Amino acid sequence: MPWRELDEPTDDDKRELDLQYRGKVQFLVDENAGIEVAKILQGSGYNAKFVADLGLRGRCDEDLFAAAWKDRRVIVTHDADFLDNNRFPPHRNPGVVVVRPGSDGRDNGGLVRCLAKAVLLAGKNATWFQGKKLDFSSDEALTITSQGGRHRYLWRKHGMPLIWED
């Protein structure tokens, strides 16, 4: 099936979501995303830590994932290894946002745009991210994988995002 436009949420929908998800999202920014991304998030009012802030610089992905789970922080990274459910199981997933880098290998502008889209979807609510892996492709299309299945979205410059229907 083709892309179709999502329905605009009603005010009641927004209020209900706000009541369900009261905790503010906190981020853990991976080394490959860079300290600049952590600073941008902090400057936007988010609780964001860079791996070095937690003594995790140079540590393996499993250590980073465990620390994020313990502190309930959403991992922000360019590293698609975090999408592997065998290494990083969904039931112990604090939330992962993977932004595939552009052709230059590092695209923090794209990362920040994609994070803004993720927060637009979730509000500022930490609970929404738990158990989800958000995978932004280099064209900023989004695939969300969770125990509830897999959903694909495509943002446009104006209007609601499109959702892919199988």
Give, region by region, the residue ranges found by the protein language model:
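Conserved BB-loop
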Residues: N47-R59
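Acidic, metal-binding active-site segment of PIN/NYN-like and related structure-specific nucleases
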Residues: W69-R87
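Short secondary-structure boundary segments
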Residues: E31, H78-A80, P101
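Amphipathic, hydrophobic secondary-structure cores in small proteins
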Residues: G55-L56, D63-A66, K70, L83
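Feature 3881 marks metal-assisted phosphotransfer/nuclease machinery
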Residues: M1-L28, A33-N47, E62-A66, S103-D166
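Short secondary-structure transition/capping segments
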Residues: C60-L64, R87-H91
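Short, hinge-like loop/turn segments at secondary-structure boundaries
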Residues: A66-A68, R92-V96
